[in-house]
Each structure stands twice: as C-alpha cells, then as structure tokens.
Swiss-Prot record:
Topological domains, Periplasmic: 30-455, 498-501, 581-585
Membrane topology: Multi-pass membrane protein
Annotated GO CC locations: cell envelope Sec protein transport complex; membrane; plasma membrane
Protein name (record): Protein translocase subunit SecD
Pfam families xrefs: Sec_GG, SecD-TM1, SecD_1st, SecD_SecF_C, SecDF_P1_head
UniProt cross-references to SUPFAM superfamilies, sorted A to Z: Multidrug efflux transporter AcrB transmembrane domain
Length: 615
C-alpha cells in the first residue's frame, strides 16, 4: 500500500529525535563560575583534599553552590565571579604548589543529563571568550645552544684522545673552528672526530685549523626538535593552568598557536607560557681571586657571573646539568624557614649528578638561574630582541654524593619559589619563544557573539517557517517541524562529538544548512504539486513527489558534502568549524526532509481517501 511506513521506521525516527533532544538540552543550562583544583605531577586530588577545600571555604565564609570530587579533580562552583576570585585566592594560599588552583567555567548541566554524558557544545574563543597567542620559536638561540654543545663535545673528545689543541672559536652558520699546534695534530683530529660525529661536516682550514659545521640534515632535525619539544612543554604548562579544551598546535615552520578558551586570568597565562626560566648547575672556579673576577681576567674555561647582590662569581663554562633533566619540583621551606625548591631528576640526570658529585666532594657548586627577557628593542624584521639574563642564586659545597633528588636554596621569597618550581615541573623551553600576536576576547564580547549568532539562527528559522506556511499551508507546517528537528539534531550531534567546537563560522554553517533544509522541502512540495496537476491521485502524487525529488536532493547534498570534506581537509580553525557544522547540517537536513516529513505525511494521509491536499 502506498504511503505507509513499517512500525520500526517510526520507532527509529522517534528514538533519533529524542536522543538528539537529550544531548542538545545541556546547552540551555549555561555555566557556573568555578575553581578547579587538580594535582600537580605525581599528586592526585583525594577525599582528604576535598575536606580541606570545604574547610577552607567555610573558614573564609565563602559560600559555594557545590564542591565535588570529579574524575580526580575538585570542582567548586559559585554564584558569581567575585566569589570565585575570593575562593581562588584563599585556596591558593592553603593548597601550596602540590595542586593547581585554576579559574574555570563549569557547565551547569543537571546530574541526570550528566549521568548519560550529555554535555553542552564546546565553544570557541569568539563565543566563550579567552586568549589567543601566536608564538615564534627563537631558532637562533636554539641552534646557538647546539653550537655550544658541539664545542663542549669536541673539546671533551680531543682531551680523551690526547690530541693537543690551542683554541676553539665560534664561526658563522653555527659552526666552529679549532686551532692546533701543527698540521699533524689537525689531521689526526679530523680523522678521529669525523667518525665520532657523523652529523658534523669537518674539514681542514688553513695550515693548522679544522672547521666543523652541522650538516643540513642535522640543522633541519634541530629546528624540528625545537618546535616539537616546545609544543610538548607548552602543553604541560597549559595543564598547570588547568584550562579546559586548550589548543596548542604548530603553524608554519617555527610558530606555535595557543588558544585558551574561557580563561579569566590572561596575565597569569602569558607569564607562565612565555617564561623561559631554567637552571644550570656548574662548578665554581676557586682558583681565581675576587680582584681578578671583578676585572674579568679569568681562564678560557671559565666565565664571570653575578649573584643577585651583584657579587662576581667565577664559574667553569662546562655545564654539569640543565633543567631538561628535571622531572618534578616542589617549593617548601627549609629548617630556617627560608624558601627552597626540591628537585627530582630523571635516571639520566641522576646518573650525571651522581658521577660528577662523587668525584668533586668538598668543592662548591653553583646554581645558575637563566632567563630570556624582552630587551625592548626590535630587529630588522620587527621582532623583539631577547636578552639572556643569568644570575647565581645558590652556591653550596658538595658534601656527599648526590642522586636523583636534592634541593636548592637562596631564593628570595615563597612566591618566587612556587613560580620556579612550576616552570621546572612543566619543563624548560628548548628555545625561547616570543609572543608575536596576542588576541584577547572578553566574556562580554563572547556573549554578544552568541546572542548575535542565536538571533541569526532564529531569524533564518522564522523567515523559513513563514515562507513554508504561506506557500505550502499544511505541508508547510510539516516542513516546519522538520526544520526544528533538524536544528535539534545539529546541536545534539555537535554536543556529542568530542572534537567539535562551535564558533561564529560554525553558526554561519548552521544558518546555511537551514536554507539547504528548506530547499529540500521546497523540491518535495513542488514535485507533489506537479504530480497533482498532471492528474495523479493524492496518494500517487505524494509517493511520486518524494521519489522524484529524492535524486535531486541527494545529488545536491552529496556535492555539498564533497566540498565540505575538502574544506575540512585543507582548512584550519574557523574554516574547519564551518565545515563541521555544514557537514552535520547537510546530513541531518536530508534525514529530516526525506525520512522525517515523509513519516508525518504517511501518518496523516497514508491509506486514506483524500481528495484534496493542503499544499
């Protein structure tokens, strides 16, 4: 019989729409200002931590909507941002640096919806507000560090082999030259070092010199490593900030994009992400007196560094260990109530420190704090010129063989200790980064974008509904129900997809798909009217109308989907957001126009003697 659906099709349609509605509902409940407490590396939030948080809030007379332990983190919700800020200040003072206390916006989804993992759509920066950074890796510094490592490595190899040399100098293009006493020593060094360092191109220069430069493959590998490692370290630092759904991705050869939606403390984010602090551990050269140190007359294997008070200290150039080997660090107070940072090393770092200290017991070792800061000047390309700042923060005699754990003192105050421990815990950047573009979108502007987007969607929907009802009467009402179902399904699917983020271009995609859905219904209705004018019966006209329109609707939507797939494959950011919502909308509009409206029409007219259609 014409225009009849089996029961399973009606059940399927109802189930799909109900599921879409359930997963779209969380978007109606908004968000609560919240404070999120997560454990730092190696520490997890527990029931005991939850009790401590509740007690602190009670003592400070701060009222929370709820405080709960969820998936290893504590989430405290508040009625206003003022209360949220007060709570964060109170909790930061109590929790210490074993926990990350971060401002956040938590979905106010009811528990019964959360139980089925129904969550609101993830909103992009333009809708939720937040901060966007475009960072550039300082490749010159990265390759300069590698040049220093090559110098140290070649010196060590020549000493080990017993080949005498007089001087080692830096050359252009991150190369180096070594001067020997005679050509014989130089030739012996070239033969030995070429085997030991296949990534260096070593050649003779002059009568008694060799020149070593990094191969193109090694330079390319070093650049790639610098960017990739900085991305990993920035991700660790973002985790320390406790930001939900951050974006950290590469852009071009030496740039990194960081997007932090919903973040409220942008100054703190900039400080943590852009910080370049690390530590170097070096032996103090006690053979040079203070007068020589003050005048800078020191041996070639040493250099003068300053303490915070401006006192000169002569350190050997050889670096025993850098912050790259630090796996964990926490701040605390020593027996004299002075701030200190407790350091834990990886196995390789522990072995280096152990082997070095066992042979140097009784000698002073210095902790050198190294940081790159903006000089306020610009280079020829308009980029900020970074200045390397070094400061001896601690000198201590090696009293025993050190292993994987030790502590450093000489830090000014607890805040500085906490900041240093956080940076060391997240990892030292392989090369300094410069923030070349910063864009902050406030929550007010984000809310304005949401309101404008909703207005655009509703306006498009209302105009479409009016058009359909005026032109197609009862069939226009049926098409209207399909449009509403289409919008519900788009929002529900967007909320379900873990990687989908809604942005302003995404809203444009939704508005576009509403137009596509109207187009499909217009095709169907016009085809039915055409069949009726050709003398078909009502039942035949409905059946032929849907059959005849199907191929046109299918072809048009498939070509649109192909374009959407191409946009998603080659596009970035906003283009991908537009492609996702458009693709989802095209699929749901086909479903609601072909299956949804047909189901309603079949219920109303299927198997009945109808002489005239309201179309």
């Amino acid at each position: 019989m014409l225009n009849r659906y089996p029961l399973w099709k009606y059940v399927m349609l109802i189930v799909v729409i109900v599921i879409g509605l359930l997963y779209a509902l969380p978007n109606l409940f908004g968000e609560d200002p919240a404070v999120q407490i997560t454990g730092a590396r190696g520490v997890a939030a527990s029931e005991q931590t939850l009790i401590q948080v509740q007690k602190t809030l009670q003592e400070e007379k701060i009222t929370a909507k709820s405080v709960a332990l969820e998936e290893g983190a504590i989430l405290a919700r508040f009625d206003s941002t003022d209360t949220q800020l007060r709570a964060r200040e109170a909790l930061m003072g109590v929790m210490g640096d074993k926990y990350v206390v971060a401002l956040n916006l938590a979905p106010a989804t009811p528990r019964w919806l959360a139980a089925i993992h129904a969550e609101p759509m993830k909103l992009g920066l333009d809708l939720r507000g937040g901060v966007h950074f475009l960072m550039e890796v300082d490749m010159d510094t990265a390759l300069g560090k590698l040049q220093e490592q090559n110098i140290d490595s070649l010196r060590s190899d020549l000493r080990e082999k017993g080949i005498p040399y007089t001087t080692v100098r830096k050359e252009n293009n991150y190369g180096l030259s070594i001067t020997f006493r005679d050509a014989k020593a130089r030739d012996e060094a070239i033969a030995y070092l070429s085997k030991r360092h296949p990534d260096l191109v070593i050649s003779s220069q002059g009568s008694n010199q060799l020149r070593a430069v990094m191969s193109d493959a090694r330079l390319s590998e070093a650049r790639e490593y610098a960017v990739q490692q900085n991305i990993n370290i920035l991700r660790n630092r973002v985790n320390q900030l406790g930001v939900a759904e951050p974006v950290v991705q590469r852009q071009g050869a030496d740039r990194i994009v960081v997007e932090l939606p919903g973040i409220q403390d942008t100054a703190r984010a900039k400080e943590i992400l852009g910080a370049t602090a690390t530590l170097e551990f070096r032996l103090v050269n006690t053979n040079v007196d203070q007068a020589a140190a003050a005048s800078g007359r020191v041996p070639g294997d040493s250099e003068v560094k300053q303490t915070r008070e401006g006192q000169p200290v002569v350190l050997y150039k050889r670096v025993i260990l850098t912050g790259d080997h630090i796996t964990d660090s926490t701040s605390s107070q020593d027996e004299y109530n002075q701030p200190q940072v407790n350091i834990s090393l990886d196995s390789a770092g522990g072995n280096i420190m152990s082997n070095f200290t066992k042979d140097n017991i009784g000698k002073p070792m210095a902790t050198l704090f190294v940081e790159y800061k903006d000089s306020g000047k610009k280079d020829a390309n308009g980029r900020a010129v970074l200045v390397k700042q070094e400061e001896v923060i601690n000198i201590a005699n090696i009293q025993s063989r050190l292993g994987n754990s030790f502590r450093i003192t000489g830090i000014n105050n607890p805040n500085e200790a906490r900041q240093l421990s956080l940076l060391l815990r997240a990892g030292a950047l392989i090369a300094p980064i410069q923030i070349v573009e910063e864009r902050t979108i406030g929550p007010t502007l984000g809310m304005q974008n949401i309101e404008q987007g909703l207005e655009a969607c509703l306006a498009g929907l209302l105009v479409s509904i009016l058009f359909m009802i005026i032109f197609y009467k009862k069939f226009g009402l049926i098409a209207t129900s399909a449009l509403i179902a289409n919008l519900i399904l788009i929002v529900g699917i967007m909320s379900l997809l873990p990687g989908a983020t809604l942005s302003m271009p995404g809203i444009a995609g939704i508005v576009l798909t509403l137009a596509v859905a109207v187009d499909a219904n217009v095709l169907i209705n016009e085809r039915i009217k055409e069949e009726l004018s050709n003398g078909r019966t009502v039942q035949q006209a409905i059946d032929e109308g849907y059959r005849g329109a199907f191929s046109s609707i299918f072809d048009a939507n498939i070509t649109t989907l192909i374009k959407v797939i191409i946009l998603y494959a080659v596009g970035t950011g906003a283009i991908k957001g537009f492609a996702i919502t458009t693709g989802i909308g095209v699929a749901t509009s086909m479903f609601t126009a072909i299956v949804g409206t047909r189901a309603i029409v079949n219920l109303l007219y299927g198997g009945k003697r109808v002489k005239k259609l309201s179309i």
